[in-house]
From Swiss-Prot:
HAMAP family: UPF0210 (MF_01221)
Source organism of this protein record: Actinobacillus pleuropneumoniae serotype 7 (strain AP76)
Top-level taxon of the source organism: Bacteria
InterPro entries in the cross-refs: UPF0210
Protein name: UPF0210 protein APP7_1551
Any Pfam family matching the protein: DUF711
Protein family per UniProt: Belongs to the UPF0210 family.
CDD domains assigned to the protein according to its UniProt record, in alphabetical order: RNR_PFL_like_DUF711
Length: 451
C-alpha cells in the first residue's frame, strides 16, 4: 500500500494538534484456573497470574509509542468477574480479593484493573451478593480497582432486586469515599459486553481466551477538526466526513493492537471504536455535535446529531478493521468532556436529555454528579430507566453516577486527571421508592413486534 506524504502530515497533525491518542491497551486475563476454596490461596494464584501475564505491558506500550509517535495513554488489565472466581471460598467478603487485584496492578504499573464484577441479569447467586455488598469497602480500600454489575439484558429482562441493591451500593460507596470518588469506579450495565477495553466497565468474559489484547482509541478532536475544515454543507456530507475520519483513526488503533499482540505473544482481540473524550479543550464529543450546527450540546437536535455521529463512526471503523468490538460508538461522560461540562453548567444539558442521548450512543449516563442527599431508591430508578433503554433497544447501556456527599445543585466536584470535574446536576423530586421496592424481574421484551 502506497502512502502519500499528505497522509503522513495528516497523521502528525492528528497527534500534535488534535489530541489523537490510543486511549488504552487492555489485557484481558482469564482467572478460572486460579480458583481455590482457600481465599488466601486464591489471592496468591490471582496475583501470580496477573503479574506473570501483564509484566511487559507497560514497557511494550512505551516502545510502540516511541516507535510510531502515537501517545498510548493507559495500560489496563481486565479479569474474569470475581463473583465467579471467588464462589468456592464461601467467604462473607471479597474485599481482600479487590486488594490483591490492586497490588497486582500496581506491581506491573498499569493504570486500572477491572473485573471486580458480578453478572446478575437473571438472578443473584450467594457469591454475586457477597461481591456486590463488598464493593463499597473495596472501593474505599483500593486505588485502581474498577467494579461493574450487569443487572439486565435483552434476553433476560431486568433484575430489579439487583437494581435495588446496586442503588444502595452506590449510595454506601458515596458515603464512605471522599466526595463520592469511589462511585467513579463503579458501572451498572444492561447488556454488558465481554471484551470492553475501557474502564470502569471492563471485565474478561467467560467466552474469551486465556489472555487477549483489546485496544481503545480516542479521537474526538480529530473528528471536530475534520468537520470544521471540510466543505460539508448537508448532513449527508457531514456523515461522510465523520466516516472517513473514523477510518483513519481506526487504522492507527489496529496497527498498535496487532503490534502489541505480536510483542506480548498474546492474541489480538478487538478494537473499540468509541470516541472517548477528555476534559482537555479540543478533545470533546459535545464540540463535534456543535460543529454540526448546534449552538450548544443539549439543545433540540442533539440526539439526532449524536445518532449521526455514532453511526458514521461505526461505518468508518468497520471498513478499517475486521476486529471491531467492545462498545464502539461515542461516549458522553459529563465530567470527562469539556463541552459537556460547559453545557451542563449552562443548564441546557440535563439528566433527561442525557438519558435520551443514551438511546443512540455508545453507553449511557456516565460520570454524572448528583446531590449527596439523593436517596438510594432514586439512584436505583435512574439505573432501571437506563437499563430499560438498553433492554428494549438491544444495546449496551450503563450508569456511572456519583452522589457527592455534602454538595447540592449549583456546586461542582473535582475528580482530577482524565475524570475531570462535574457540576452537580438535579434529579427529579418525585419518588420511585415503592416501585423499586417491589423487586422481582421486569420480563424480557417481545422481539417480533418492534414498536
Amino acid at each position: 500500500m502506497s502512502i502519500q506524504s499528505s497522509e503522513i502530515i495528516e497523521t502528525i497533525k492528528m497527534v500534535a494538534d488534535q489530541n489523537f491518542d490510543v486511549r488504552t491497551i487492555t489485557i484481558g486475563i482469564d482467572l478460572h484456573d486460579c480458583i481455590s476454596a482457600d481465599i488466601d490461596q486464591l489471592n496468591q494464584n490471582i496475583y501470580q497470574k496477573i503479574t506473570t501475564i501483564g509484566k511487559d505491558l507497560v514497557e511494550t506500550a512505551k516502545i510502540l509509542s516511541a516507535k510510531y509517535g502515537i501517545p498510548i495513554v493507559n495500560q489496563r488489565i481486565s479479569v474474569t468477574p470475581i463473583a465467579q472466581i471467588a464462589a468456592a471460598t464461601k467467604a462473607d467478603s471479597y474485599v481482600s480479593i479487590a486488594q490483591t487485584l490492586d497490588r497486582a496492578a500496581k506491581a506491573i504499573g498499569v493504570s486500572f484493573i477491572g473485573g471486580f464484577s458480578a453478572l446478575v441479569q437473571k438472578g443473584m447467586s450467594p457469591s454475586d451478593e457477597v461481591l456486590i455488598r463488598s464493593i463499597p469497602e473495596a472501593m474505599q480500600t483500593t486505588d485502581i480497582v474498577c467494579s461493574s454489575i450487569n443487572i439486565g439484558s435483552t434476553r433476560a429482562g431486568i433484575n430489579m432486586d439487583a437494581v435495588k441493591l446496586a442503588g444502595e451500593t452506590i449510595k454506601r460507596t458515596a458515603d464512605i469515599t471522599p466526595e463520592g470518588f469511589g462511585c467513579a469506579k463503579i458501572v451498572v450495565f444492561c447488556n454488558a459486553v465481554e471484551d470492553n477495553p475501557f474502564m470502569a466497565g471492563a471485565f474478561h468474559g467467560s467466552g474469551e481466551a486465556d489472555a487477549i489484547i483489546n485496544v481503545g482509541v480516542s479521537g474526538p478532536g480529530v473528528v471536530k477538526e475534520a468537520l470544521e475544515n471540510s466543505n460539508a454543507t448537508t448532513l449527508t456530507e457531514v456523515a461522510e466526513v465523520v466516516k472517513k475520519t473514523a477510518f483513519k483513526i481506526t487504522r492507527v488503533g489496529e496497527l498498535i493492537g496487532q503490534e502489541a499482540a505480536k510483542m506480548l505473544n498474546i492474541p489480538f482481540g478487538i478494537l473499540d471504536l468509541s470516541l472517548a473524550p477528555t476534559p482537555a479543550v479540543g478533545d470533546s464529543v459535545a464540540r463535534i455535535l456543535e460543529a454540526m450546527g448546534l449552538s450548544v450540546c443539549g439543545t433540540h437536535g442533539t440526539t439526532a446529531a449524536l445518532a449521526l455521529l455514532n453511526d458514521a463512526v461505526k461505518k468508518g471503523g468497520m471498513m478499517a478493521s475486521s476486529s471491531v468490538g467492545g462498545l464502539s460508538g461515542a461516549f458522553i461522560p459529563v465530567s470527562e468532556d469539556e463541552g459537556m461540562i460547559a453545557a451542563a453548567e449552562s443548564g441546557i444539558l440535563t439528566l433527561d436529555k442525557l438519558e435520551a442521548m443514551t438511546a443512540v450512543c455508545s453507553v449511557g449516563l456516565d460520570m454524572i454528579a448528583v446531590p449527596g442527599k439523593t436517596p438510594a431508591h432514586t439512584i436505583s430508578g435512574i439505573i432501571a430507566d437506563e437499563a430499560a433503554i438498553g433492554m428494549i433497544n438491544s444495546k449496551t447501556t450503563a450508569v456511572r453516577i456519583i452522589p457527592v456527599t455534602g454538595k447540592d445543585v449549583g456546586e461542582s466536584v473535582e475528580f482530577g486527571g482524565l475524570l475531570g470535574y462535574a457540576p452537580i446536576m438535579p434529579v427529579k423530586e418525585g419518588s420511585c421508592e415503592v416501585f423499586v421496592n417491589r423487586g422481582g424481574r421486569i420480563p424480557a421484551p417481545v422481539q417480533s413486534m418492534k414498536n
